[in-house]
Amino acid sequence: MLPYPQIDPVAVAIGPLQIHWYGLMYLVGIGGAWLLASRRLNKFDPTWTKEKLSDLIFWLAMGVIVGGRLGYVLFYDLSAYIANPLLIFEVWKGGMAFHGGFVGVMIAAWWFGKRNGKSFFQLMDFVAPLVPIGLGAGRIGNFINAELWGKPTDVPWAMVFPPFSDPAQLARHPSQLYQFALEGVALFIILNLYARKPRPTMAVSGMFALFYGIFRFVVEFVRVPDAQLGYLAWGWVTMGQILSLPMIIAGLFLIWLAYKRDPAASKAAV
């Protein structure tokens, strides 16, 4: 069993003002995405300025935050927020959902592309390789917060999370680290290696949807579901799996459609 590093979730406290590591991880994700995007910008569109890129990253970040919050409300705890709608604004208490954030990013990309002469999938193909930076940073934030841990296990790398998070004090899968490794590191490598060569429009977006969906679906088998939801079917199906399955199907379809529309790219990939 590995010891859980006792990291204070509060990175900096100045009087009543507290800056949490989880919030800082959002800044790391946004900053990292901007840096990578700036390196890839000339290949995407040489006419775009760094200012336009900054505008894009800003609106994508807004999509993540607003969509992530509303996604959690709708998918994970709707009854509580219907009973007290003001809870929606208490973001410091947690409650963000990737799938909602993903929808927010898609809406932001569609809106920004429409205003700047880019199709939805042109922008999404550019954005997709940036996303794992934010995903990885977010999972580190979850780990520091000692939240979203996994099921009890006796694997050598199991961890006992702090009593405030897990009163049962059981050795558990560090599922946040699994997600960091898969959604952050592995997905980053897959997408950025794949996007190094010219690909037909929609293909990179399809690869993102496919592999994120697979990775999330798999990790859900060892991650404890949200207490207010539990398992939704057959004693093992979680909300995360239900939301990820359409991503897998959509990803396969987008990849197929991308290469069907561009037979030359399909031959080059063989």
From Swiss-Prot:
- Stretches of the chain forming a coiled coil according to its record: none
Q: Enumerate the UniProt keywords alphabetically.
A: Cell inner membrane, Cell membrane, Membrane, Transferase, Transmembrane, Transmembrane helix
- GO MF terms on file? phosphatidylglycerol-prolipoprotein diacylglyceryl transferase activity
Which sequence ranges are marked TM in the entry?
10-30, 56-76, 92-112, 120-140, 175-195, 202-222, 237-257
* Class in the EC hierarchy, top level: transferase
Family annotation (InterPro entries)? Lgt
What membrane topology is annotated for this entry?
A: Multi-pass membrane protein
PROSITE patterns given for it? Answer: LGT
Q: Which GO terms describe its biological process?
A: lipoprotein biosynthetic process
Instruction: State the GO CC annotations.
Output: plasma membrane
**Which Pfam family, any one, appears in the UniProt record?**
LGT
Entry EC number(s): 2.5.1.145
**Pathway noted in the entry:** Protein modification; lipoprotein biosynthesis (diacylglyceryl transfer)
Residues binding a 1,2-diacyl-sn-glycero-3-phospho-(1'-sn-glycerol):
R139
Q: Where in the cell is it found?
A: Cell inner membrane
User: NCBIfam families annotated for this entry?
Assistant: lgt
PANTHER family linked: PHOSPHATIDYLGLYCEROL--PROLIPOPROTEIN DIACYLGLYCERYL TRANSFERASE, PROLIPOPROTEIN DIACYLGLYCERYL TRANSFERASE
Any idea what job this protein has?
Answer: Catalyzes the transfer of the diacylglyceryl group from phosphatidylglycerol to the sulfhydryl group of the N-terminal cysteine of a prolipoprotein, the first step in the formation of mature lipoproteins.
Protein family according to the UniProt entry? Belongs to the Lgt family.
Q: What is this protein called?
A: Phosphatidylglycerol--prolipoprotein diacylglyceryl transferase
| Species in which this protein is naturally found | Pseudomonas syringae pv. tomato (strain ATCC BAA-871 / DC3000)
- What gene name is listed for this protein? lgt
